[in-house]
């Protein structure tokens, strides 16, 4: 099965070349697929199945017209699958426009309330960012997602946390696909300890082990709150959900209590003492190699170079992620500089790559 990925932020030329050879499955972002339709470099007239995944996210990001254009380029006789975590009016409109006599399947969000410990803290609106640092210094989770309601707040909070010594990155809409990939790779391989994100940008993010979720702002949508905290406490792990609430947000907390059929538990920020040591550093560092699948680079090639010429052990090498043109490898923090120097002056699979 030949699969092609068409995303914005990647060179158009190689995508056009790949499309000329055809594909069984195309996975892409609405904007880039619409660009290819406009250029005449993609033909959707024989599409049998159209999947609109994370539909609410795409609509929130302003892609409704692009989606409509893609649907119009597909044959009328087709199977269309629309997936959405929420079902607001815009998605009802999309369903009516893009689907014919659809069958609706609804899966209720379910989380083991005993597996996720929820703690609520009252803060002033201006004190949120300082409170996030206070929570991180006290609980010291290895990996945390901090949810903000706006991208501006995401950027501000991530910058403040970095200034205080935390390894923090911001994830929000309007990032290029390459930027998003780099951020997600670093968070997934534990090179970044705190991911500050909007709900829209964090959709589809799958991190198996997450130490904590911090709700920097209380969500007005109870289902969104449940989706947020459900990212921690997966499998058999215990989860920790920490929510900051300004006085004017208590009405939203009341909705959460109604949904959960029970009161939330409040705690006092003033009682939190910093744990020993300074801000928790991410245990890993990510190296970026300017080569990927198009260069026939494989994870085993990089692992061989690191454990061979560089002299690292397998335990000092973390996750290796190979993309079309880039490769990312997580290394134990204390070995990263040595590995960077060795690889910069050495070779991988008999070839030199920029780092």
Q: What is each PLM-predicted segment?
A:
Residues 1-355:
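Conserved helicase RecA-like core
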